[in-house]
Amino acid sequence: IDVSLVGSEMCIRDRPKDYNSYGSRRGNHEVMMRGTFANIRIKNEMAPGTEGGFTKLYPEEKIMPIYDAVVEYKKRGTDLIVIGGKEYGTGSSRDWAAKGTKLLGVKAVIAESFERIHRSNLIGMGILPLQFINDVNRKNLKLIGSELISINGIENGVNPSDHLTVEIKYLSGEIKKIKTLCRIDTKNELEYYKNGGILQYVLRNMI
């Protein structure tokens, strides 16, 4: 743990005897943000040859911890999208999987399919889940992480199960447009998303 971002953060705060597990730190957003996407079994296709919470910062093409890259993108005002495969979000600690994603500045997740509870939790955090359709996926789109991705039409609002156009601009200048399925499945979920998440929805209905 002494080489991880979480370990470094806790060393700074003088708690080396109390590291314990992520589960014991679920109330500490600084720890949990740094732990999001940090599972040692994760292999980020943007950063080949690495395991765990690493990515490649663009346009510098620099391999670095995901959290550090997020901090840099926030400075630049760059919104983030996660691209995933099948059953995206499967695993334990599902609530923090969505909370951490939100805190890292992710606006949408585009995947081949979603684990049921995680899809719902993403919406509860105000994150838009989109699903690839028509046999399109990250591999046949040849995505490497340097692309600029725009989701067309969301500024005008979305509806459950809408088909939304995603525009992908490659470094070469090539532009591809694909259809995706909006995985906001119900009117209640739509209200949560429109309000920026379930907590904001509840607060606005209380005031």
Q: Would you name each region that the model predicts?
A:
Residues 8-207:
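Fe-S-dependent hydro-lyases/dehydratases of central metabolism
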Residues 1-7:
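Single conserved hydrophobic/aromatic residue that forms the stacking wall/gate
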